[in-house]
Structures are given as C-alpha cells and as structure tokens.
C-alpha cells in the first residue's frame, strides 16, 4: 500500500501528541527529568523507519517547540530538545561510520556537549540557583552524576538499537497499516 501524505501526517501527529504527553507526565511526577525525554525520543523510531529522517526531524522539531511551550519543567524540556530528542536520527546517521571507536567518541562528545549546553542555558535563564543545586553535594557528586549520565546514555543507545530491531522484526509486521 502506498503511503499517502495524510497517513504520514496522522502517524506523526499521534506520536507527537504521545511524546508531549510523556514529557508532561514526566514533569508532573517530577521523576522523569531524564527518563521521559528518552521515552519520547523512542517514539521517533517508527517514523524514522517508515518515512525517513526528514519526517522524523520534523516530528522532533514539533515536539521540541511544544515541549518548551507546554512543559513546566524547563530542564526536562531542554533535555529533550538539546540532548536526546534527535538521537534516533543521529544514531542512524552515525551508523555509517565504519570505526566503532570513532562512532562512540562522537556519540559521547555530542551527548556531553549537549548536556553542558543545557545546564549553561539553565544557568543563563535561572541564574545561580541551578548552579547552587548542582554543587550542593560537592564536586565529587557532580562527577558521579556526569558518570551516571554517560552510563544512562550508553543504555539509551542500546535501547534505541534494540527497539529499532524489535520494530523492524516484529511490530512492523503487526502494524500493516503503516506500509
């Protein structure tokens, strides 16, 4: 079955709405600052696989704008916008690099650079309150948080790969209306 523009827009709209709801729930429960953006990013996988990076990036941009406007927790919204929301698309593009070491160096450089950018933006917008919160338990705790963040990112990368394979091998066959 040929994919019409209406079908593409409908799927993107549904997954975009679900992404925003996940971000809102993460903010409301105040436990999903990092988990909710990762879950929302996973919803790009079907769009990326079915319609390509153009539609996936349009979905990401739409969810990003809506999250900044609607999600009350700025850190959560920024984490989606700058750190993890686009990652499934970036991961697919980086898969073209033959060297595994170079690929991982780029992935971690992008993740850490984007994370630093988020906190610099939060510092610029919220003032020293964010810095005081980060340094409240000392520099050692900040280093431990950065290490935990990198471990979480590595797990997220593994999850994106596993979910992409699961979608292609199992879900795609069950969701015949997408293709």
Locations of the language-model features?
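Alpha-helical transmembrane segments and their cytosolic interface
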Residues: 4-5, 139-179
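Short helix-perturbing small/polar motifs within transmembrane alpha-helices
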Residues: 81-120
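Membrane-interface helix termini and inter-helical loops of multi-pass transporters
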Residues: 124-138
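Transmembrane alpha-helical core residues of multi-pass small-molecule transporters
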Residues: 40, 59, 63-67, 83-84, ...
């Amino acid at each position: 079955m040929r994919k019409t523009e209406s079908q593409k827009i409908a799927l993107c709209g549904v997954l975009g709405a679900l992404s925003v709801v996940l971000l809102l729930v993460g903010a409301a429960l105040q436990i999903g600052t990092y988990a909710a953006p990762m879950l929302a990013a996973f919803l790009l996988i079907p769009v990326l696989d079915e319609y390509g990076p153009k539609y996936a990036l349009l979905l990401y941009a739409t969810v990003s704008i809506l999250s900044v406007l609607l999600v009350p927790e700025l850190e959560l919204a920024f984490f989606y916008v700058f750190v993890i929301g686009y990652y499934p698309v970036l991961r697919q593009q980086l898969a073209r690099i033959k060297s595994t070491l170079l690929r991982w160096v780029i992935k971690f450089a992008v993740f850490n650079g984007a994370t630093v950018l988020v906190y610099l933006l939060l510092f610029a917008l919220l003032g020293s309150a964010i810095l005081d919160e980060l340094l409240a338990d000392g520099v050692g705790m900040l280093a431990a948080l950065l290490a935990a963040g990198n471990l979480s990112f590595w797990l997220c990368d593994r999850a994106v790969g596993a979910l992409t394979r699961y979608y292609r091998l199992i879900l795609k066959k069950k969701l015949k209306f997408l293709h």
